């Protein structure tokens, strides 16, 4: 495994006007080079640290680009997170979501705080959310050893072969069954199913000869609608060797995303930054995403995810002592907008940043403000402090307060409903059962049909 201390930043400016030239290219709408991106995200490699004046120039350029590309709408989706299982043996050092899979085995006597849901439980959870007005379910889960693409896949896996990372369902208290069964259950509940990351697709073809195409075609037939481009982290293998040595390579991640596009499934893309990587790694990651979009024209949004370091192995082992600074977060959003000239939507995540900072980032180039999220586990387990739910009324109030227009959207942005922040009742309209009734989290202790979303 690569030592994090070996990830040096050795970029030097090509001229003493490198930052000014990069900023001019950004302002004029020219396609940025990797060198341009590095100049902008560092506010100039000719100086140490982030220059406040230059930073503001980058943020202003990004906000103008946002206004030119998508206008003043701030979008969000009424959605639910339905994570199927926390069982996982991958051992990513940035993650505190998973629980080692052997703890879920029937013979393991010690208690653990994880969970595994059956397809019936997933269906019931999603059906309840759909009835209350949600349109999308996002499902990202641990790589449970009993998971297979379908029953034929599980039959082909050998529990005695360590490369298969497989144990039969009877070894566990709860059988997650298969990806196809879970997707079908959520789809049957009426949701737009946004699921099966490239890493999950990799897990769904382990030990057999079929590729990502067959995985995504099978799951599309089962009811999968779109694919979250998470598990990207940093798409530079020397970084991945430090933070997630058990995960797929950059080339494998890209191949899975291309297969999803070939199967007719829309995708998103992400970056998880603020740990061991440097500024050049961040821009090389954006370059991989931009090249992928040039080929597929399939990515609807890009989501910068700032590393939440508390309670993660990277922090507990002393590999990192914190995450990205506020200025780095602002520049990550801004340069994503400027560099990714072929992706319309850039997301600011209130789960990662909180409401106030998340709103501020909407003035740095972002135009989407994530989703209502009736349940969220991944960031919370890593130490995130910003809650699990925002109502449609919350969105209307926050977005209108910064002078922008709140718009509920579908996952693929094709269906949009402008929210009137002055309406007597404010609720979702896009979902199959949405009728404007206020959407309230079960955790709020308020009946779903009470006033005051």
Swiss-Prot record:
List of residues binding [4Fe-4S] cluster: 88, 92, 95
CC cofactor note: Binds 1 [4Fe-4S] cluster. The cluster is coordinated with 3 cysteines and an exchangeable S-adenosyl-L-methionine.
Keyword Metal-binding carried by entry: yes
Pathway membership: Cofactor biosynthesis; coenzyme F0 biosynthesis
Ranges for domain Radical SAM core: 74-344
S-adenosyl-L-methionine found in the keyword field: yes
Protein family (similarity comment): Belongs to the radical SAM superfamily. CofH family.
Protein name: 5-amino-6-(D-ribitylamino)uracil--L-tyrosine 4-hydroxyphenyl transferase
Species in which this protein is naturally found: Halobacterium salinarum (strain ATCC 700922 / JCM 11081 / NRC-1)
